[in-house]
Amino acid sequence: MDVLELLRVSGSNMYYSTFLADAWCYYISNQITMTMYLYCALGVLSMLFIGWFVYFKRLARLRLRHEIARSLSAVTMASGGDLRGPRFRKRDKMLFYGRRMLRKMKNVSGQMYSSGKGYKRRAVIRFARRILQLRRENMPLEVRTVEPPAEYLEETMEGSDRVPPDALYMLQSIRIFGHFEKPIFLRLCKHTQLLELMGGDYLFKITDPDDSVYIVQSGMINVYISNADGSTLSLKTVRKGESVTSLLSFIDVLSGNPSYYKTVTAKAIEKSVVIRLPMAAFQEVFKDSPDVMIRVIQVIMIRLQRVLFTALRNYLGLNAELVQNHMRFKGSSQGAGPSVYCSQTTRQATGSASATASAAAASGTAGSTHTAVPRPASSLSRYSQDEQHTLSDPNPGIPNLELSGDSVNTLFGEVNGGARLNSYPPLYHQRESDGNLSTRRGSITQQEQPEVGPVPSIDMRLVKSSAVDSLRKELGLPEQDAHIIDPFVEVREMEPNVTLITEGNADDVCVWFVMTGTLAVYQGNADATRIKQDKTDLLIHYVHPGEIVGGLAMLTGEASAYTIRSRNHSRVAFIRRAAIYQIMRQRPRIVLDLGNGVVRRLSPLVRQCDYALDWIFLESGRALYRQDESSDSTYIVLSGRMRSVITHPGGKKEIVGEYGKGDLVGIVEMITETSRTTTVMAVRDSELAKLPEGLFNAIKLRYPIVVTKLISFLSHRFLGSMQTRTTTGAPGAPVEANPVTHKYSTVALVPITDDVPLTPFTYELYHSLCAIGPVLRLTSDLARKQLGMNIFDASNEYRLTSWLAQQEDRNIITLYQCDNALSPWTQRCMRQADVVLIVGLGDHSHLVGKFEREIDRLALRTQKELVLLYPETASSKPANTLSWLNARPWVTKHHHVLCVKRIFTRKSQYRINDLYSRVLLSEPNMHSDFSRLARWLTGNSIGLVLGGGGARGAAHIGMLKAIQEAGIPIDMVGGVSIGALMGALWCSERNITTVTQKAREWSKKMTKWFLQLLDLTYPITSMFSGREFNKTIHETFGDVNIEDLWIPYFTLTTDITASCHRIHTNGSLWRYVRSSMSLSGYMPPLCDPKDGHLLLDGGYVNNLPGHLWRYCRASMSIAGVFPPFCDYRDGHLLLDGCYTNNVPADVMHNLGAAHIIAIDVGSQDDTDLTNYGDDLSGWWLLYKKWNPFTAPVKVPDLPDIQSRLAYVSCVRQLEEVKNSDYCEYIRPPIDKYKTLAFGSFDEIRDVGYVFGKNYFEGMAKAGRLGRFNQWFSKEPPKRGNHASLNEYTFIDLAQIVCRLPETYGLNPSDLFSEDEDCDGYISEPTTLNTDVRRYQVPRGGNSLSLSETEMDMDSDVEMDLKMERKMDKATQSTPPLQSKAQILRRKHSKEEARHEWEIKREQKQELAREQELERERELSQKGTTAGATGYTPNAVIATQTSLIFMDEEDEMDKKKTKDNDRDEVRGSAEDKGKEKEEDKENRSNTNNETKNYL
């Protein structure tokens, strides 16, 4: 509200323009100073007189007592006796006089409340209470403010004292290679050596063999890099407990290729002790445990992709610099060039007749890599058009090589007549649009080429034979093992610009070998330092004939990290992923050859970075670095969550921020070379990549583009910090006001009691999250079915953590549904969770159970949020939330969720899955509480900020209606002054009709002038006492707390006790709304009961920001109009929040809102003032004012100056909000309405509605409304984005190769258990049926929440199903009822049958292999073998066909068995249901007969 406008009430306002009011204000303004001094003098004289009187009375009484005591002592001495009688003790006096007073009060109260008597006495007492304010209010219940435990802000200092330091350091260093069992670790320890180095001694030098892992036990080692000019540059400093090793050199040593240091040197800075572990020790271990070797290779490849590539590509902008771009020649050690294919196949096809052409082709390709093989002139025109679409190289560092792929394609692809072989089904897909790719800048120049005769026909069998031979060499297999890969090799012919595989696709992962032509490898422009990502792909490198690609994705088991396209006409040979894994079972060593192929392709830069980059694993509570330590490195969070805590000089700790997956930690301190300003610790188990400062300097010198990336990153970070200036300096700032990122990757769901419907709740939340992005729901059953029943054992720690990390990487958020007991899965969920949602029933008891306390003990540092569920009934509203929060001081935030009827329906687990299989196919309701919770978890919340402006705040109601019609959800609400009132109404009701009705009634009460006159008081602090104003707000809200509102709400007030603004997110609603409306001069500040601080209108500092009405009243405490409101918590005086921030959008942004709509209805000051010079005369102003013939001047008067001074902070905050990118600032045209024009409520509301409707329609046409009402994707998400768990399974190569116990997938029969026969909720988590993919398909429909009609439809469907089943039972024989024990026995027999079926299947496969080998031997003896493989195509086809038929028969038998079991279980369940229905009907009939008899 505006003080100046209140002092300038126009004559048009009929309620305040009376003569009596004007005379009263004029008299008070002139006489207030004299009256104040007079009363002060009278008060001082009165105090002096009273003090003098009391002093002399006290002195006289003391003299009298002294005389009496002296007389008694004289008498006692004379008589020699004791004259003391019975003593009247003080306690007895208090009891005596207390009883007398109570008897009198009882008589008085009896007279007052007797019928028709004591009326005058009651009136006098009521008048006295009103004047003297003797009324006593019961203070409301408030949230107990409990400091978080010490573990929440402190690191864990517990050390591993039982482990020797050298063993501990070694264990931590080799952890990068994966998990080792204890016997293997002890065998590795036997090979360790201790090296003692003095300062300046070399640990290793250039040309030394790179065959060891070095671990620093004490001292410091400096690792240098040597440049070409002979200069050296420090790469990193290795301290105690750290290691020096290279993962790429480790693969070289295992592959048998000796590696030497070429540019890296290590020297001791001081006296040091280093542990040396030879890599040959691993070879000895791997001979006995091949599964360990394969697992180590897989871990190294995963670390290479997640650490090296993530750091260098996403944060330093290096893409093509990571791969060597060279062409392999004929003399290469692995594979052969295209000339070899030409000469070999030509000789085999035509013998000596075509030797001349073959030799010419061979000499043409071997002589120069840039010379094309001659081709017929007729084909030039054909290829010239295709070559125009060949992609150019956007990176000038990569040579644009013109290869002979097209001519070789002519030799292989075009036979007599020019027909191409297209007999194979296409694996690839042609791109529909190549608009994101740049076309070639220049055409190919046609050179003079000699004519060549006709090319002879080529047999595709020989082409495949050549491909098999080349792939065999690439995989490191001997010649006699060619038959192993022959059945799996496929050959395809590619047109130009054909996509073989796309980035992020896990379905078509293959090992590609280029026979002719060229493949181009691209990667998306994923720059972590940019806000808007480019959709263009970056060219990484070319794959030339004789080279292989795809080994990295094959070894990691993850999706492809690149997009591969054909650059021109090409022929490729490939082996699919499943085939590679089958080959690995027979020849595990191909894992090393694939890994070696990946390593050979990397550039020297990657090898140098491999020495500097470190992979760090931090357990929960461990510190990454501490405050005031030196900053020599930065860190990238790969997985987990980190918390930054600052320690103030007084010892108090405060949260500065939290970091999630993909965040960069400590970059500013490292670049500015300052010490660490905070302590960063792990909230949960986390993986990080460490980038030392020396590596940054080395890369900056070689690639200046890195500097640009760092500047861009720092600029965006500083810009974001400026726009999200924190408000933690205020005493009332909540924990959420800290700049903590409210975006979580993993969420654990924990039920408070067994009757909580956790599975339906998880499904509903999963349904809403699917509209935002890819999400995954994990349960204990699903983990066991995917990874085995023993997956939670300690020996399977690596498999479980790797699988969970893979799922988290592929989804924006992962839901961990915990068990109802403290099981290993529940403990794992606590270790993996970024936030824990504690789910309870709002209408049940708030007591804390033992299980919940154990959860708090397991996750001390993890943020916990309370979710209370309420049924969808007309009378259900949140209540008693304070009791829930006080019983759980560890909860940082709470959510009220209104649930549809289907969540509380008591159904079996099978029926719940069946119900949500249909629900998940529909669109979620974006206005539901589940969608609001989903947006909060993913950091996409939408906030609404309502500013102050007096009666102009009626426009907020119209804007709310327009927002609702525009389809914009509201997740958070904040308000100041009148905005606090309107926002609180919306959060309480969420119905625009009810909100409008209550706001209109309150506005009518504000127009009753006689009530305002009765509220006038002597204007020492304010003009009004605020009693009637408090009454109107209290009647509007009642005794409601802010915690009981449906939508998260806050109001902002001005604390004049602490001289700052305060944010209120809990407490009495009406009081803080009242204090936010306490405009200075009109209403006294509200005294905060918490600390006694005086609170004024929050608009004085920020005009856009317990029992509910108290804080609403505090937010409306206009200074001078109403007295400041005293906070019932601390006693601070609160005034209107408009003095500090009239539109607190910045506060809303700090509380977690990503998109904000700010509505400002405040008055605008006139800035067009008159320049009157250096001095100003009041007489001159008076002359200008009264002279009608002079030009008017605009000079602010005293009240105007005071008002402008009060709103200085508010105006500054408002300008920052207008210029921010996260806020949509809206100001309706309501300037013509005065601050106190409450009688024009409907008119102002209509103005706001019409303006808001037109405004949002304009935003929709401009395409700017999507970020508010279209938070889910318009297009159906692709299969890769919403893939099911079966599509993204963790590939454990060790399990595949070494034939470890296999796990079972999701079978339909596994979804049926004995729990289905029970009534009520089955809290044990489970999964959907087999077709999980269709539940993640985009929804089709309008709403998630089912209406009554939809619920009836569901019930009708269920009734139809029941009738169909009854009809089936009527025609068929009803199976007998089965007990639970029988079901358990049948389940056990099913498992045995499945085991027997698998044994038979393996026996059939072994028999087929034996028959195949016998057939091969027979064919070899007859001399009818083809090529070097000893294998006929017909035999291969026959063998494969027999295997396929056997598999189909097995699958049919298995499916038939499962269908029978499912029918039996369903039949038993239906029979039980029928029996229960019959019993229920019999009981009801018996009751009716009894009633009739009575």
UniProtKB/Swiss-Prot annotation:
Its EC number is 3.1.1.5. The active site is at S977 (nucleophile), D1097 (proton acceptor). It catalyses: a 1-acyl-sn-glycero-3-phosphocholine + H2O = sn-glycerol 3-phosphocholine + a fatty acid + H(+). A nucleoside 3',5'-cyclic phosphate 3 binds at residues 590-717. Residues 944-1110 form the PNPLA domain. It is a single-pass type I membrane protein. Keywords: Developmental protein, Endoplasmic reticulum, Hydrolase, Lipid degradation, Lipid metabolism, Membrane, Neurogenesis, Phosphoprotein, Transmembrane, Transmembrane helix. One of its GO terms (molecular function) is lysophospholipase activity. A motif (GXGXXG) lies at residues 948-953. Residues 1-35 are lumenal. It is found in: Endoplasmic reticulum membrane. A nucleoside 3',5'-cyclic phosphate 1 binds at residues 176-303. A motif (GXSXG) lies at residues 975-979. Interacts with Pka-C3; interaction inhibits the catalytic function of Pka-C3 and the esterase activity of sws. Phospholipase B that deacylates intracellular phosphatidylcholine (PtdCho), generating glycerophosphocholine (GroPtdCho). This deacylation occurs at both sn-2 and sn-1 positions of PtdCho. Its specific chemical modification by certain organophosphorus (OP) compounds leads to distal axonopathy. Plays a role in the signaling mechanism between neurons and glia that regulates glia wrapping during development of the adult brain. Essential for membrane lipid homeostasis and cell survival in both neurons and glia of the adult brain. Belongs to the NTE family. This is Neuropathy target esterase sws.
